[in-house]
Amino acid sequence: MAALFNRIIPILFVNDLAAERDFYLRLGFHVTYEGPEYPDFTALGHGTVEFGIERKAGFISDRPDQVLAWQFGVKDIEEARQRLKEAGVPFTEQLMSPSKDWQYRLLHARTPNGYHLLLEEGSD
C-alpha cells in the first residue's frame, strides 16, 4: 500500500512576518509562495524542506519556544555556522555525546519571533 502522507509543511504563527521572512532568506531559504490571495502568509523552501510563516491576528505567545523547537538537519555544520554569522544571528554551539561512538554538534539560535531554532549536524 502506498503511503497516504507524503510531506509535512508546518506553518509557524508570527507577529512580525517581514522580520521572520528576512531571517530565513538570510540563512539561504527562498520564497516558494507569496501572493495576494493570502497576504499574511509566506511559504519558504530550501532543497526538500518547505514550511510557511503566517501573521496571525491575536498571536500573543511571548514564549513560542514553549510551543515548538524548530530543528533542521544540515549536511554541513560549518556552512550553517557561517550563514548564521554572516546574517548577524547570535547562536551557541553544543557538542552532543549520546554515547561513546555517537557525537554531533547543534547550533542554537532564536528567530525574530522567538522560536528556538536548532541546526543539527548530521549525515544523509
Where do the PLM segments sit?
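A generic structural micro-feature
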Residues: 2-4, 62-66, 101
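N-terminal beta-strand motif that seeds the catalytic metal site of vicinal oxygen chelate
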Residues: 1-19, 68-70, 120-124
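Short amphipathic alpha-helices within nucleic acid-binding modules
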Residues: 23, 78-83
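Conserved short beta-strand elements that form part of the metal-binding/catalytic scaffold
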Residues: 31-65, 116-122
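Helix N-cap motif at beta-to-alpha junctions
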Residues: 16-17, 74-78
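Vicinal oxygen chelate
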Residues: 1, 34, 81, 85-124
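Short beta-strand micro-motifs in enzyme catalytic cores
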Residues: 40-42, 68-70, 103-107
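Core segments of cupin and vicinal oxygen chelate
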Residues: 4, 11-50
